[in-house]
């Protein structure tokens, strides 16, 4: 069991629970290293065993990228949450922590439908406090990301000139970023010019040409 998982399990046990369900995509990536899209997995952590619930599309990837988990493909007629509830019942989990902010009402209903004898307790996130304290490796990754972003921006400056479209600039920035080792973007690249787009804080790059 990796250190991050063990810290979560220990904290959950300290609060009187014998299991925890984790469904937030970024938390799952942090704890397991899984790089698949968000919303395609749910974790069930217990003292004895940990489960990674997904669907058939991601079974192979989950098995490759995660360690210390039993990868479970949800059964016919079940979804990620109902399958997780079923596993909790089969594992004999009596009191299970969940982060209510990460579940919809339907998710919760699916979860409890398969585990009538398990008490699911909504609490705050157990993972976010852990993520807030950065390891030396994480700090180095952040510093590297800053270097990539800075160098990509300075390389872009030669491209920004009258007649070039916002889309051209966005494409060049993304090229510069990836060519330096960048692996992805938090959101669609924002390139906004002129009195209209320039005032829109979430503008998307358009075919508008840069003007003086």
Located regions from the model:
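Terminal domain-start leader segments
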Residues: 1-51, 82-92, 110-113, 119, ...
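Flexible, acidic/His-enriched mid-domain "rim/lid" segments that flank
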Residues: 3, 79-185, 196
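A generic local secondary-structure boundary/capping motif
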Residues: 9, 31-32, 86-87, 131, ...
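Structural motif
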Residues: 23-25, 54-56, 75, 98-103
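Short helix/loop capping segments that flank catalytic or ligand/cofactor-binding pockets
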Residues: 31, 61-62, 106, 199-202
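Acidic/histidine-enriched ion/cofactor-binding microenvironments in catalytic or ligand-binding pockets
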Residues: 44-46, 185, 198-212
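Compact, glycine/acidic-enriched structural inserts
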Residues: 53-86
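Basic, ligand-binding patches in group-transfer machinery
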Residues: 191
């Amino acid at each position: 069991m990796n250190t991050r998982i063990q810290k979560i399990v220990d904290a959950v046990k300290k609060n009187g629970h014998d299991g925890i369900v984790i469904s937030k995509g970024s938390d799952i990536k942090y704890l397991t290293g899984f790089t698949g899209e968000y919303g395609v997995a749910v974790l069930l952590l217990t003292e004895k065993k940990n489960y990674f619930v997904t669907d058939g599309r991601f079974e192979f990837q989950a098995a490759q990228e995660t360690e210390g988990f039993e990868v479970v493909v949800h059964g016919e007629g079940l979804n990620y949450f109902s399958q997780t509830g079923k596993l909790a019942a089969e594992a004999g989990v009596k009191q299970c922590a969940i982060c209510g902010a990460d579940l919809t009402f339907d998710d919760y209903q699916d979860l409890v439908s398969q585990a009538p004898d398990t008490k699911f307790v909504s609490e705050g996130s157990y993972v976010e406090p852990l993520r807030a304290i950065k390891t030396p490796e994480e700090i180095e990754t952040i510093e590297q990301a800053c270097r990539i972003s800075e160098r990509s921006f300075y390389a872009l400056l030669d491209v920004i000139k009258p007649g070039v479209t916002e889309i051209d600039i966005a494409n060049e920035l993304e090229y510069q970023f990836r060519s330096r080792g960048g692996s992805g973007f938090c959101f669609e690249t924002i390139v906004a010019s002129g009195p209209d787009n320039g005032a829109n804080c979430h503008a998307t790059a358009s075919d508008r040409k840069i003007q003086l």
